[in-house]
Amino acid sequence: MEDGTLFAGAGFGAPAVQAGEVVFNTGMTGYQEVVTDPSYYGQIVVMTYPLIGNYGVTAADGESRQPWIRGLVVKELCDRPSHWQAVGSLSDYLAGCGVPILAGLDTRALTRHLRSHGTMRGVIATLPEGAEPGPAQVAAWVETARAFRLEGAVRSVATAAPYRIPGPGPRVVAVDFGAKENILRELTARGCDVTVVPATASAEEVLSLRPEGVVLTNGPGAPTDVPEAVEMVRGLLSQGDLPIFGICLGHQIAALALGATTYKLPYGHRGANHPVKELATGRIHITSQNHGYAVAAESLPPEVEVTHVSLHDGTVEGLAHRRLPLFTVQYHPEACPGPRENRYLFDRFLALVDRSAVSTRTA
């Protein structure tokens, strides 16, 4: 770790010296979705559940074309998976993609270290069997960790060119900041005619597609790293009647466009079991989350209301504009992994699209 703390275990996957931001995920399942989630770009992920890999990897469970993590840390790695859809082991899959795995260490102690000291940078390094690192080697790893910078994250994972997924329903533009596949599947399952555009798209380029609604997707890194996206959302908001739905990083970018600020959390929210309270109804939702930043509630303008809060730390988990057709959530309604109860938010978005279309026709 960048503070000099050393955790030793057995190396699997690809041999490497790999630096990244070390974070932890509290999910019991869904490791394939985690490693292929573009929001984890540049991160070394510690799984707190003690046994990982027991159902292998499947052809259907990936959330993108490849793993995006810099490394995986587990207590116990199962190398003989059992599942009727498995096409291989997690270890072989990550090894083929150049991702190292560190297993056999005390992940509880590592997680408590991160909770106490905050998210920090670290290095996964493999040595020949039986070799022990000397002080000079450890010092070199510490310097490698401290030198790591997460730069150009969104650009690295987002689409470089627009593409369309035809459908019979309303025209929806999804701005890709690192979208998980299931966001697009949820939209197309509801009949949407989806056009996915790069994160660098301007408001003019988005509007030229004549969208009836816009989805701002999830993605990696800090929202302040994509100022061009903030300007794009401001341009969309200036239309006054275009429905917008922000998810995770998209939620944060929308908040910046509305004049709010964001800040980095001590150790983030990552897992499939985070309770969130919907303030209007008092209902509690169990949500899938993966974010290291949050919107500062005190920075929100009067026309924006907080709709959801985390029951863990009270941070903002949802926003809505009092006048414009915009709402956002910090968590992942598409799940994958995690509970599916929050998919109703896609229906809420499409209801907003329908109401906006009716208003336009009758204006």
Swiss-Prot record:
It is an enzyme of class 6 (ligase). Disulfide bonds: none annotated. One of its GO terms (molecular function) is ATP binding. The active site is at C248 (nucleophile), H332, E334. Coiled coil: none annotated. Residues 1-171 are annotated as: CPSase. L-glutamine binds at S39, G219, G221, L249, Q252, N290, G292, Y293. Its EC number is 6.3.5.5. Pathway: Amino-acid biosynthesis; L-arginine biosynthesis; carbamoyl phosphate from bicarbonate: step 1/1; Pyrimidine metabolism; UMP biosynthesis via de novo pathway; (S)-dihydroorotate from bicarbonate: step 1/3. Keywords: Amino-acid biosynthesis, Arginine biosynthesis, ATP-binding, Glutamine amidotransferase, Ligase, Nucleotide-binding, Pyrimidine biosynthesis. GO terms for biological process: 'de novo' pyrimidine nucleobase biosynthetic process; 'de novo' UMP biosynthetic process; glutamine metabolic process; L-arginine biosynthetic process. SMART domains: CPSase_sm_chain. It comes from the Bacteria. InterPro entries: Anth_synth/Amidotransfase, CarbamoylP_synth_ssu, CarbamoylP_synth_ssu_N, CarbP_synth_ssu_N_sf, Class_I_gatase-like, CPSase_GATase1, GATASE. Residues 171-359 form the Glutamine amidotransferase type-1 domain. It catalyses: hydrogencarbonate + L-glutamine + 2 ATP + H2O = carbamoyl phosphate + L-glutamate + 2 ADP + phosphate + 2 H(+). Pfam families: CPSase_sm_chain (PF00988), GATase (PF00117). Small subunit of the glutamine-dependent carbamoyl phosphate synthetase (CPSase). CPSase catalyzes the formation of carbamoyl phosphate from the ammonia moiety of glutamine, carbonate, and phosphate donated by ATP, constituting the first step of 2 biosynthetic pathways, one leading to arginine and/or urea and the other to pyrimidine nucleotides. The small subunit (glutamine amidotransferase) binds and cleaves glutamine to supply the large subunit with the substrate ammonia. Belongs to the CarA family. PANTHER family: CARBAMOYL-PHOSPHATE SYNTHASE SMALL CHAIN (PTHR43418:SF7), MULTIFUNCTIONAL TRYPTOPHAN BIOSYNTHESIS PROTEIN-RELATED (PTHR43418). HAMAP family: CPSase_S_chain. Composed of two chains; the small (or glutamine) chain promotes the hydrolysis of glutamine to ammonia, which is used by the large (or ammonia) chain to synthesize carbamoyl phosphate. Tetramer of heterodimers (alpha,beta)4. This is Carbamoyl phosphate synthase small chain. It comes from Symbiobacterium thermophilum (strain DSM 24528 / JCM 14929 / IAM 14863 / T).
